[in-house]
Amino acid sequence: MENLQSILPEDKPQTPVLEPHNFFLYGAPMAGKSYFASFFPHPLSLNTDGNAEQGTAPAIQIRNTFNRDGSLNQNSIYQLSSIVVALQQPGVTYRTVIVDVIDDICTMFEQAICKQYKALSLADIPYGKGYQLLNTSLQQLVLDLKALPMDVVFISRELDKTDEKTGRTDYVPSLKTKYYDIVTGNCDAVIHFTKIGNEYLRQVTQKRANYKKADIKNPAVLKLLSSCTGMFTNEK
């Protein structure tokens, strides 16, 4: 009989591995998000913007396609699932996956689910099943990407929210809060991109740990993250 204790790790403290691999970028159009992401090592862009040809990274256009009768031909949920399986195979040379943009992926998932159930909206699918399917599909995608031995970059647009009392304007990701929580809950850093005149600014708004430059093993990634204000703590 197998010794069940053999599957347990040794009972002693482990040295944390702090190297970040999952990133969430958001900002206004033309703030440099896709350009920045394209400099990650050996990137593959899963593109929804229709501007993949303008970048240097190899890209796959993610989309739902339809038959003449309006029924679903290509399902974006299954398309992305197949891509993840392909990236899991031996000999794959890609080292970064870019999801550009995650907002559109959520919209496509919703559209695919509604078509599958012949509903106009998720609310029309009984017992909340539509919302459950969308949440599950997004969670599965994020977890599958995170499990890859690669860097993963999610890109989102931004919204401006102005407080009527104070007049203060804050810039937040356009991704709905419940989906934002699913994605960023599996990310190591959130980076806000802005462009003022000809200057591009990158500010880390959230991070999982107090990273040091020594935590980053890949020189190309280190160079990218070093350009983001607030990424590294107490280091010049």
Indicate where each model-derived feature is located:
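Hydrophobic, Leu/Ile/Phe/Ala-enriched alpha-helical segments that form helix-helix packing faces
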Residues: V84-Q88, L141-L145, C187
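Conserved acidic residues
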Residues: P43, R95, M150-D151, D188
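Intrinsic-disorder-associated interaction segments
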Residues: N73-S76, Y127, N218
